[in-house]
């Protein structure tokens, strides 16, 4: 399933970022950042009235010295391309402008749901000034105040009404769903073509030539797969040249639909910050991961080269210490078959469930080897551990006081559980909970 994307659009200086920060800071439950993951905060994942969604702030687009009209068009184009619901924001103090009307025309042609928000309605008397905005053709305008936080609940109530009911993909549960992600020009499309043995995706040495993603079913050695080629990691002409951070939005959709995520990095260029950002999305979604080092044919090698590169990957991607690393050349078609055992193992472990009795024996043994911590004379007591979910495997540890479960000890228990049950390729989550 994929979360709906809500985009806040409008001309500059109408308060988009203020409203985004209001929604993120006060009205939405934000997914906690993962240590070691670098991420631009132009989107957040949250929920409103039990509806989960991704919300993006187009106020941060950097176009450099491009004309004013190009900025407006860039914001609207991104929203049209990626959003499921659009919050179109205008400013009551400046009234209806020609730029507002231009944005409205673009959004109207998109045929996507648009909720009109009139910002800076800071007192009840100003509500009388919103009626001019009816002429934009998007129904009732919603008066809000970013500075005072007024009207946001009514606005979000209307937004979630436009969410489609989420449906599961129709693929068989034994089919492994793969998304292939990475920064532009690391060879994602070439990897897809090499796996499938045909040019299913346009490939060019210019970053961003991949078409819109199309699922492709594939079988190998008796296992069925669905490849989701994430065209979302592309750029689209001049409009996207300085907005690379927005290219993750479509990749997020593909990640959410996946069992296993292949994170592709360029062996020739090495690891850069954008690789970490891309990898962070998969990790935070709790997906099984395989790291694919592509273009391995371009690297001068000796007997230690692969180990040195793997060590560097481990150092740079410490939050993905569970992921296997495959070295391939999509262009030459070499070492591709080494991918599939890693993919299969990661998928199997992602779905794995373990018996509570055996699990508690492992935890008891772990505590005997490394006793629980104390704080101000109080010791953490672990009463019982149980698995409450899979995909990813999630465990609740019942304790006397959650505050006594230090991060380091939780990580220790995680490592012991991982080692005992063989959870290679998948994250596992441990949730301490106070026993009543």
Curated annotation (Swiss-Prot):
GTPase that plays an essential role in the late steps of ribosome biogenesis. This is GTPase Der. GTP 1 binds at residues 10-17, 57-61, 119-122. Keywords: GTP-binding, Nucleotide-binding, Repeat, Ribosome biogenesis. Residues 352-436 form the KH-like domain. GO terms for molecular function: GTP binding; ribosome binding. It comes from the Bacteria. Pfam families: KH_dom-like, MMR_HSR1.
